[in-house]
């Protein structure tokens, strides 16, 4: 109903079983991309092109090296969640230490080491406050880094709030990875209303 022909599923701490994944994709005639969302010492990182979770991936430097070796692609997910909304009991994942100073301007955040270890920045996340998404977009702009969007949906309710739109049609995981490395994508909004457009600040 929304016009989705494909989905990328980023399971926490490890991708779905490959055979189960392929069976589901074939059964429903949909392009499914298998990936994972890894909890690291520098927040959550989306990892594409990695076959399985490996020991040491909780260190983003280790994950980054493994991704490069495998021809993968990694993205810092919702990097500034809770920076402005500041929930009572949770620190932002990029600034976990009590004495970590929270950024106010994009220039305050641009030197965080995470941005030297990932390929792109998620700037449109369905589970993150608009102000924090906008801030991520501004930081990525200062750094001239590629940007992505994602629903971060944990049920069908949130699917498609934000997406990553690709210039060319994606038919499989290989084409998906090639498009990521080519930079031929952008975050988008409006899929749910039938008015897909680039996400901008």
Predicted regions and their residues:
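General small-molecule cofactor/ligand-binding pocket signal
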Residues: 33
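Active-site flanking residues adjacent to catalytic metal/cofactor-binding acidic residues
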Residues: 10, 36, 77, 151
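Ordered, amphipathic secondary-structure segments that act as subunit-interaction surfaces
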Residues: 57-61, 77-78
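Charged catalytic cores and adjacent phosphate/nucleic-acid-binding surfaces used
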Residues: 2-4, 15-30, 38-55, 65, ...
């Amino acid at each position: 109903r929304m016009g989705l022909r494909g989905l990328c599923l980023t399971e926490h701490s490890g991708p779905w079983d490959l055979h189960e994944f392929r069976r589901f994709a074939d059964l429903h005639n949909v392009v499914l991309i298998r990936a994972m969302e890894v909890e690291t010492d520098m927040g959550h990182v989306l990892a594409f092109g990695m076959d399985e979770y490996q020991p040491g991936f909780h260190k983003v430097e280790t994950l980054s090296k493994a991704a490069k070796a495998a021809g993968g692609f990694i993205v810092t997910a919702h990097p500034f969640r809770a920076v402005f909304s500041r929930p009572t009991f949770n620190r932002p994942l990029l600034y976990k230490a009590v004495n970590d100073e929270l950024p106010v301007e994009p220039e305050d955040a641009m030197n965080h080491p995470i941005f030297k270890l990932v390929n792109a920045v998620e700037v449109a996340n369905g589970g993150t406050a608009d102000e924090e998404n906008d801030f991520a977009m501004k930081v990525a702009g200062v750094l001239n880094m590629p940007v992505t969007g994602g629903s971060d949906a944990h049920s069908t309710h949130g699917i498609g709030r934000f997406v990553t739109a690709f210039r060319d049609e994606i038919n499989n995981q290989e084409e998906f990875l090639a498009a990521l490395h080519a930079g031929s994508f952008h975050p988008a909004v409006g899929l749910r209303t039938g008015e897909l457009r680039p996400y901008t600040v």
